[in-house]
From Swiss-Prot:
Gene: nuoH
Keyword tags: Cell inner membrane, Cell membrane, Membrane, NAD, Quinone, Translocase, Transmembrane, Transmembrane helix, Ubiquinone
Positions of transmembrane segments: 10-30, 50-70, 82-102, 115-135, 161-181, 187-207, 235-255, 275-295, 310-330
Organism classification: Bacteria, Pseudomonadati, Pseudomonadota, Alphaproteobacteria, Rickettsiales
GO cellular component terms, semicolon-separated: plasma membrane
Identification of the protein by name: NADH-quinone oxidoreductase subunit H
Annotated GO MF terms: NADH dehydrogenase activity; oxidoreductase activity, acting on NAD(P)H, quinone or similar compound as acceptor; quinone binding
Description of how the protein assembles with itself and partners: NDH-1 is composed of 14 different subunits. Subunits NuoA, H, J, K, L, M, N constitute the membrane sector of the complex.
Catalytic activity, reaction form: a quinone + NADH + 5 H(+)(in) = a quinol + NAD(+) + 4 H(+)(out)
GO BP field: aerobic respiration
Described purpose of this protein according to its UniProt entry: NDH-1 shuttles electrons from NADH, via FMN and iron-sulfur (Fe-S) centers, to quinones in the respiratory chain. The immediate electron acceptor for the enzyme in this species is believed to be ubiquinone. Couples the redox reaction to proton translocation (for every two electrons transferred, four hydrogen ions are translocated across the cytoplasmic membrane), and thus conserves the redox energy in a proton gradient. This subunit may bind ubiquinone.
The organism of origin for this protein: Rickettsia canadensis (strain McKiel)
A Pfam family this chain is assigned to: NADHdh
InterPro entries: NADH_UbQ_OxRdtase_su1/FPO, NADH_UbQ_OxRdtase_su1_CS
Broad class of where this protein is predominantly found: membrane
Length: 339
């Protein structure tokens, strides 16, 4: 009986503890990212932001969570009740399970699988289903139009995002996210310089993927009231909200992993190795999240035709050309990784 416990039950307990250790801090980070966003945008607009609930407004996310938790969930009369309830759950769960393959530091990863890149792409592709189901189940033309916009936008920019990732795979030779980070220790500086434009394209693509400004067409308030979540209140709205911000942190972590060296120090200086890798990872992710907030505070919303033109007529040809360019240069200079 003891051997059965150690062989089957004990590993499951360890996995459950790891999941809790990732999920709980992530939800706290998501809650306080909303606070940081309101403070940063307030400063950029020369106002204070939240400053009443607790010292410096630090308890504002908790007050918001309590308010949403105790509000009455209202389900529209002619909606599909089951799908209406399931949609925000799907969106929130998918935003969490992507973290399973993210390496926070050397050896600090829940599932160090050899197809981590494919796993991330699969999760990002599935996230559109929660939004589509929410728009359709709400039985509202505004919600449905927002969901259609979101699906078209996410599918359009996933193409260029996938091609950008191919350029990274050409230089690193692995689908394992930890392997991609470790490969960046030895990549020549000129290859990093060649990947820099693709890093910018990837960041633009994930802005569209997460429906953030200047690409927040699915929830354009002036046109669609609130988009696909217009009929949601209480915890349904909260789960969509948490999912959006968890996805923001996830795509920032992916950008860090692919282009900024993940948990590696930014410079090859010996004393920087004394600082834990998790600190560097968190610092880089925090910088990218600040860029998200900066863009939201400064840039206007694109028109929908401009959004699609940018995705299909600018970013897609550019990434296709860059895949050919990178592969040709790597082959000519004999820097193609051995797989």
């Amino acid at each position: 009986m003891t051997s059965l416990f150690f062989e089957y039950t004990f590993p499951l307990i360890i996995i459950a503890l790891k999941v809790v250790a990732i999920t709980v801090p992530l939800i706290l980070c998501v809650a306080y990212l909303t606070y940081v966003e309101r403070r940063v945008i307030g400063l950029m607009q020369l106002r204070r932001g939240p400053n009443v609930v607790g010292p410096f407004g630090l308890l504002q996310p908790i007050a918001d969570a309590v308010k949403l938790l105790f509000k009455e969930p209202i389900i529209p009369t002619n909606s599909d009740r089951i799908l209406f309830i399931l949609a925000p759950m799907i969106t929130f769960i998918l935003s969490l399970i992507g973290w399973a393959v993210v390496p926070f530091a050397k050896g600090l990863v829940l599932a160090d699988i050899n197809v981590g890149v494919l796993y991330i792409l699969a999760i990002s592709s599935l996230s559109v289903y929660g939004i589509i189901i929410a728009g359709w189940a709400s039985n509202s033309k505004y919600a449905f139009l927002g969901a259609i916009r979101s699906s078209a936008q996410m599918i359009s920019y996933e193409v260029s995002m996938g091609l950008v990732i191919i350029t990274v795979l050409l230089t690193t030779g692995t689908l394992n996210l930890s392997g991609i980070i470790e490969a960046q220790r030895t990549i020549p500086w000129w290859i990093d310089l060649m990947l820099l434009p693709m890093g910018v394209v990837f960041f633009i693509s994930v802005l569209a993927e997460t429906n953030r400004l200047p690409f927040d067409l699915p929830e354009a308030e002036s046109e669609l009231v609130a988009g696909y979540n217009v009929e949601y209140s209480s915890m349904g709205f909260a789960l969509f909200f948490l999912g959006e911000y968890a996805n923001m942190i996830l795509v920032s972590a992916m950008t860090t992993t692919f282009f900024l060296g993940g948990y590696l120090p930014p410079f090859n200086i010996s004393w920087l190795d004394c600082i834990p890798g998790f600190f560097w990872f968190a610092f880089k992710v925090g910088f990218l999240l600040f860029c998200f907030l900066w863009i939201r505070a400064t840039l206007p919303r694109y028109r929908y035709d401009q959004l699609m033109r940018l995705g299909w007529k600018v970013l897609l040809p550019l990434t296709l050309f860059w895949v050919v360019l990178v592969s040709s240069v790597l082959m000519y200079t004999d820097h193609l990784p051995s797989v």
